[in-house]
Amino acid sequence: PHFAQSFVRAYKLAMTPPHEPVMIALDAELQESTTHERAKLAIPRYVPTSPPQGDANAVREAARLLANAERPVIVADKCARTAGGVKLLVELAEALQAPVIDQKGRMNFPNTHHLSQNARGRALIGQADVIIGLELSDYWATVNGHIDNGEDDGAGLNESHIKPDAKLISISSILLNTKSNYQDFQRFQVVDVEMAADAEATLPALIEAVRQALPAGRKAAIEARGQAVKKAWSEARERTRVAASYAWDARPISTARMAMEVYAQIKDLDWSSVGGDRQLSAWPTRLWPMDKHYHHIGGPGGYGVGYGLPAAVGAALANRDAGRFSVNFQPDGDLMFSPGVLWTAARHKIPLLSVMHNNRGYHQETMHVQRMSNRRNRVAFVGKDLGPLGTRIENPDIDYAKLASSMGAYSAGPITDPKDLAPALKKAVEAVKAGEPALVDVVTQPR
């Protein structure tokens, strides 16, 4: 009976914001012992826990600050848990005509909406007089920066990105996730209004409070703010389009070309991007129209190597039951930490298209080694064959298509000519639609 109780309790914890994994440890003796009085065994009834909502007084104060702000900014990281959460965030932004910076811990805000302002994030933070952070993983890093320049005895320098009199509001359930040892708090950031609550659950009350607090005489100013933001959104979209066109026919293949070739094959499907895209300059979230909460599941909670494909396979399993097409851009070094998950996907017939971002290196580390070498006036590259030691995956080059094939997945590549992308991807998409995992190995630019 204790196991059943623990399992239901663990499930309740995992499904209550902030949603995080729960581990159950079963003693070996318990697993091997004979069960007595089987008739008395029972599984407790599961009743979902209502997510915590923000205090009414704090909600009103936050609404007052936002309604009277000249330059309010909304920053969301893991705010929208559901389709309803995306809709609520749009309502709040439209009520204020406030720009939204989506940090993409989840798909919080449609990038097709003119209030989506990721491209201007740093500038908007610096201009804001009121900033509201919704489920931010790292509020300090949102409003501050670190200059890794070797000053201060090698520690670097910290700098604030906000005005001295800017007001900060936080709604986050992470404050309720205090653990016995390791924490997820990041650096401490002083804020003016702080609510230990689930942001999505608090948004309806906040939206209503904002509407009541908006001064009648500010309607024209708010509309003008929205028009200015819309103009900036259009200009940013055009800059992104132009930037994506650079090196379109280059070899190795540009990551923007790869992203758009994939989109051309899946745009008419009910698709879901189930991997992070930071390593390929975030082209999918910058170029693909994303307006559904499952269009992007968000990136990892940290920077752990080996996260990508296991997370993508798990999301693809959930999407299989929903009838969605799952696609994952898979970094090469990341895959080598857990290649066996390809077998898992093939064994359980989990439909997933994985497109390799094969830059033949741990490029995050390559850039860091180069930066440190510059600082210390050292050579970062050691000969033609060795290159930057410990950061390249070449000599020999890994054939990821053969690796995937050996695990039972459909595969194609390595592809080095961008003209070969479309036909290879088309066949891979058909394999995934037939219910199997597929991997296309694409040799790419570093970012």
Predicted regions and their residues:
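Conformationally flexible catalytic loops at phosphate/diphosphate-handling active centers
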Residues: 9, 13-68, 242
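Active-site diphosphate/adenylate-binding microenvironment
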Residues: 229-318
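Glycine-rich, acidic loop regions that bind phosphate or pyrophosphate groups
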Residues: 1-5, 102-230, 425-428
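Glycine-rich phosphate/diphosphate-binding loops that line cofactor/substrate pockets in enzymes
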Residues: 12-18, 58-73, 92-95, 125, ...
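Glycine/aspartate-rich loop-and-adjacent alpha/beta segment that forms the canonical ThDP
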Residues: 30-53, 138-147, 151-155, 402, ...
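Conserved thiamine diphosphate
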Residues: 1-32, 107, 125, 133, ...
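Gly-rich Lys/Arg/Thr-decorated short loops/hinges at beta-loop-alpha junctions or inter-strand turns
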Residues: 34-47, 234-246, 292-295, 380-385, ...
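Thiamine diphosphate
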Residues: 122-127, 203, 282-446
